[in-house]
């Protein structure tokens, strides 16, 4: 579910940073253009979704213009599925693109608060609440500015009652000139049904605004209401787009399972059909304390009466009621015969609220009843037991410590059957209910206090009403897979689906086999799925229709989700390890999870960047002002700048080599990243190095692991991505995004990021074309290197790890403005001179002065070895 309540245009206007808030209404503002309020116009909102094998990649784009003559703050609250992870958030301000970076939560929060305190345009995307239900972005929009917000999120669509459901919350609350939802679905198994509907408009009124179709493996849904179709009446200026837009579909199932393999990762879907239902033994543990009085208890009764209608004759049940004490309908479980069900209805109708809340004793009574029924053979041998508890508050009598109740319940169940906890309303410790359910192989649901609470309760029961298998184990060939997600389940319920993903040890295997074992209603079953790898390639040959390495991302998504669940009940070292693994994957795959946040700030305003690398202009005596964090760049003749934050100072050296020479700037054997630069000379033909200026005219950035190369020259940027070539001009404003990579060109500035922790900036320096001596050249900045390994080397890379130096004996030099000194570094004693360079990262024309100590003789004594050790034969 993505609520466009604010991302779509229900904007809360004013300014967080000094401007008064002024909420607006469209009604009655006839003098304003349609869709404009308080000077802000949301003129476009689009949702583009690509679903590949249940994995949905969704991009929400909203375009806003501030017509006012003062800055305005725009706040967006975006409702998403609780299981979705945001993967990217991009601001485009007046045509300039600023991407988000996923960071550890506290790091992102500090960076955002610093930007806001300085009055800078900044947006923070963070998980809010228990289950990632809401993401908030606030941005200060300058007068006359256009801002585009692009939010990307991914989720695995879960099968629910026989259908996959994509749920979009649509609430623009004003007319939007261009509003559209486009959904493309690709399912290798073939699509068996596809539907779409909106809660805010009847199917008759949807008319031409909605189109839906499916054939074979592909499905498509489009919703594009015109301005007239958005109005509740012909003269209205508000919008009727306010509610749910739901897409449902299912796939063909020629066999119970389906395995798909792409680039060494696999996903296994399992959903058998036509099996007999396993009889179930249900202990309903119901809170009837005083707080349940009135509508809550009445809705609970209505739901239980409906559930009794669905009970099968083979099922067994009992009701355990708890308040200050515990009472039961029967002494033990009874079969769901017509006579017993009628008696149960009478009992449910008679339930009355009273007293306190004794969760511990209520649960233990229900669990004991199930255990005893099994021990005394009162229930069928091939049956399964379930505890369903409903409460609206916290324990306040008897054992009331949550951790002790959890321990008691865990010991009593002993892993034999699941516990499902239903939390009614908001006045309860939901985390406690959720954690207790998760560690007992169940889950928790919040039942919202609303008119449909009884339907919510009944809907939950329908999910678990028909177990088809128990004790499910998914097995693969020994030593053939790595990093497997959860592959054992206590139950498989009708209408659901089991999803397992992992990594293949050998990508070149010819076939792949998967076995699923489980206990059915009448016998034990084994389902075998064998995959021919060549046939698999044919089935997935329509790769243009799907996005990227979707199975790898699906695997990462599932792994993170399951690590976070395990983490909730872990302690000490185990919890630390689970947290570290989940955080590492969240950062690697750019997922916003409870451990991470995403922050966007204008790069030229952001002073939090860890490191920077640039190459200034022809003035060798430019200057340098070191920031507080490590800073590296290469510039000029070329000049290399190395900042050491521990010293609040910087070092500089030149490399004098002939035009055409290629130098190794960065090489990291662990991440596969390399950066090389080729030297060019000025326009003079003289080979005299004392007078001839040299610069970097060409850069090669490559990542062997990602099969990615980019060649940057003063004329163009050429990208090779898995053998696909793309060429861009420096005049282009373009962004390229793929798993783990973003590349943005904005006139004389290019930003290349490899996930979180590695970011480079290339600056184009242009001179007058008819200048008799100078020519265009490039500057290279390292703005973040903290994710590069300790084995990184190169003329710049060797300094990414901390090192120490000492400056002493400062004395007058040949130039009174540039003192000399003695530098002790790496066991070498060197003569250095104070000078300055320029950082052109913020302004390619003027630059910013930064002071440094200059090391002579091509950096000898400062760099490892000699400078000729860094000469390489070519860019790649």
From Swiss-Prot:
Keyword Secreted: yes
Modified-residue entries (Aspartate 1-(chondroitin 4-sulfate)-ester), positions: 637
Gene3D superfamilies referenced in this protein's UniProt entry, alphabetically: von Willebrand factor, type A domain (3.40.50.410)
PROSITE patterns assigned: VIT, VWFA
Domain VWFA per the UniProt entry, residue ranges: 281-464
Compartments where located: Secreted
Signal peptide: 1-18
Residues excised as propeptide: 19-31, 638-876
GO molecular function annotation: serine-type endopeptidase inhibitor activity
GO cellular component terms given for this protein: extracellular region
Recorded coiled-coil stretches: none
Glycosylation sites: 88, 577
Post-translational note: Heavy chains are linked to bikunin via chondroitin 4-sulfate esterified to the alpha-carboxyl of the C-terminal aspartate after propeptide cleavage.
Main location: secreted
VIT domain mapped to chain residues: 26-155
Matching SUPFAM superfamilies: vWA-like
Alphabetically ordered keywords of this record: Glycoprotein, Protease inhibitor, Proteoglycan, Secreted, Serine protease inhibitor, Signal
A Gene Ontology biological process term: hyaluronan metabolic process
Assembly, per entry: I-alpha-I plasma protease inhibitors are assembled from one or two heavy chains (HC) and one light chain, bikunin. Pre-alpha-inhibitor (P-alpha-I) is composed of ITIH3/HC3 and bikunin.
Protein function: May act as a carrier of hyaluronan in serum or as a binding protein between hyaluronan and other matrix protein, including those on cell surfaces in tissues to regulate the localization, synthesis and degradation of hyaluronan which are essential to cells undergoing biological processes.
Family label: Belongs to the ITIH family.
Protein name as annotated: Inter-alpha-trypsin inhibitor heavy chain H3
Naturally occurring in which organism (per UniProt): Pongo abelii
């Amino acid at each position: 579910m993505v609520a466009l309540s604010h991302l779509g245009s229900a904007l809360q206007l004013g300014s967080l940073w000094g401007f008064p808030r002024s909420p607006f209404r469209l009604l009655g503002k006839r003098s304003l253009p349609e869709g404009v309020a308080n000077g802000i116009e949301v003129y476009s909102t689009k949702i583009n979704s690509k679903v590949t094998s249940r994995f949905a990649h969704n991009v929400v784009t909203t375009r806003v213009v501030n017509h006012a003559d003062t800055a305005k703050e725009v706040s967006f609250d975006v409702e998403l599925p609780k299981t979705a992870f945001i993967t990217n958030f991009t601001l485009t301000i007046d045509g300039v693109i600023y991407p988000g970076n996923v960071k550890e939560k506290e790091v992102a929060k500090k960076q955002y608060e610093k930007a806001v305190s300085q009055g800078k345009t900044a947006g923070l995307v963070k998980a809010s609440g228990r289950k990632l239900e809401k993401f908030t972005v606030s941005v200060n929009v300058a007068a006359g500015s256009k801002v585009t917000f692009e939010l990307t999120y991914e989720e695995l669509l879960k099968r629910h009652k026989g259908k996959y459901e994509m749920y979009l919350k649509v609430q623009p609350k004003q007319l939007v000139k261009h509003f559209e939802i486009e959904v493309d679905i690709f399912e290798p198994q073939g699509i068996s049904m596809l539907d779409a509907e909106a809660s805010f408009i009847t199917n008759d009124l949807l008319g031409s605004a909605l189109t839906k179709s499916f054939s074979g493996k592909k499905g498509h849904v489009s919703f594009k209401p015109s301005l007239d179709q958005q109005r509740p009446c012909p003269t209205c200026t508000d919008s009727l787009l306010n509610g749910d837009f739901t897409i449902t579909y299912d796939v063909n199932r020629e066999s119970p399972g389906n395995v798909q393999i792409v680039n060494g990762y696999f996903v296994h879907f399992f959903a058998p059909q036509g099996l007999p239902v396993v009889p179930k033994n249900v202990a309903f543990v119901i809170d009837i304390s005083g707080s349940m009085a009135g509508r809550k208890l009445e809705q609970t009764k209505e739901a239980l009466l409906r559930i009794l209608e669905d009970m099968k004759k083979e099922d067994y049940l009992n009701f355990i009621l708890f308040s200050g004490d515990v009472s039961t309908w029967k002494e033990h479980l009874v079969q769901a015969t017509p006579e017993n069900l009628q008696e149960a209805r009478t009992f449910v109708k008679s339930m009355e609220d009273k007293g306190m809340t004794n969760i511990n004793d209520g649960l233990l009574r229900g669990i004991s009843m199930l255990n005893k029924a099994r021990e005394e053979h009162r229930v069928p041998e091939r049956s399964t037991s379930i505890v369903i508890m409903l409460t609206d508050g916290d324990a306040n009598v008897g054992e009331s410590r949550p951790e002790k109740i959890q321990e008691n319940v865990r010991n009593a169940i002993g892993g034999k059957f699941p516990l499902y906890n239903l939390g009614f309303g908001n006045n309860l410790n939901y985390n406690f209910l959720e954690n207790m359910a998760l560690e007992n192989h169940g889950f928790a649901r919040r039942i919202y206090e609303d008119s449909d609470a009884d339907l919510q309760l009944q809907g939950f029961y329908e999910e678990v009403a028909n177990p088809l298998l128990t004790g499910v184990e998914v097995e693969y060939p020994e030593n053939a897979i790595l990093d497997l997600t959860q592959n054992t389940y206590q139950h498989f319920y009708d209408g659901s689906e089991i999803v397992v993903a992992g990594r293949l040890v050998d990508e070149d295997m010819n076939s792949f086999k998967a076995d699923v074992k489980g206990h059915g209603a009448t016998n034990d079953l084994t389902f075998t799925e064998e995959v021919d790898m060549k046939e698999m390639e044919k089935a997935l040959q329509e790769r243009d229709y799907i996005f990227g390495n979707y199975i790898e991302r699906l695997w990462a998504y599932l792994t993170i989700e399951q690590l976070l669940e395990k983490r909730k009940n872990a302690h000490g070292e185990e919890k630390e390890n689970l947290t570290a693994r989940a955080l590492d994957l969240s950062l690697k795959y750019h997922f916003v999870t409870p451990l991470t946040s995403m922050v966007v700030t204008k790069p030229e305003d952001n002073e939090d960047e860890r490191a920077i690398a640039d190459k200034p202009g022809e003035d060798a005596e430019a200057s340098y002002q070191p920031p507080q964090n490590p800073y590296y760049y290469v510039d000029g003749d070329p000049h290399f700048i190395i900042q050491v934050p521990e010293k609040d100072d910087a070092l500089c050296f030149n490399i004098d080599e002939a035009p055409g020479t290629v130098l190794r700037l960065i090489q990291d054997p662990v991440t596969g990243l390399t950066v090389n630069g080729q030297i060019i000379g000025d326009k003079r033909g003289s080979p005299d190095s004392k007078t001839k200026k040299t610069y970097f005219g060409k850069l090669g950035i490559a990542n062997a692991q990602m099969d990615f190369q980019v060649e940057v020259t003063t004329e163009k940027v050429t990208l090779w991505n898995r053998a696909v070539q793309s060429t861009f001009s420096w005049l282009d404003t373009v962004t390229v995004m793929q798993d783990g990579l973003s590349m943005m060109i904005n006139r004389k500035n290019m930003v290349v990021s490899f996930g979180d922790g590695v970011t480079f900036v290339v600056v184009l320096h242009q001179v007058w074309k008819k200048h008799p001596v100078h020519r265009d050249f490039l500057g290279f900045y390292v703005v973040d290197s903290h994710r590069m390994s300790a084995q990184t080397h190169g003329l710049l890379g060797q300094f990414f790890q901390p090192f120490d130096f000492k400056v002493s004996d400062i004395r007058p030099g040949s130039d009174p403005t540039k003192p000399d000194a003695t530098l002790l570094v790496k066991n070498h004693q060197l003569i250095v001179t104070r000078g300055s360079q320029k950082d052109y990262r913020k302004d390619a024309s003027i630059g910013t002065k930064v002071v440094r100590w200059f090391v002579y003789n091509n950096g000898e004594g400062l760099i490892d070895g000699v400078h000729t050790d860094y000469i390489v034969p070519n860019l790649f």
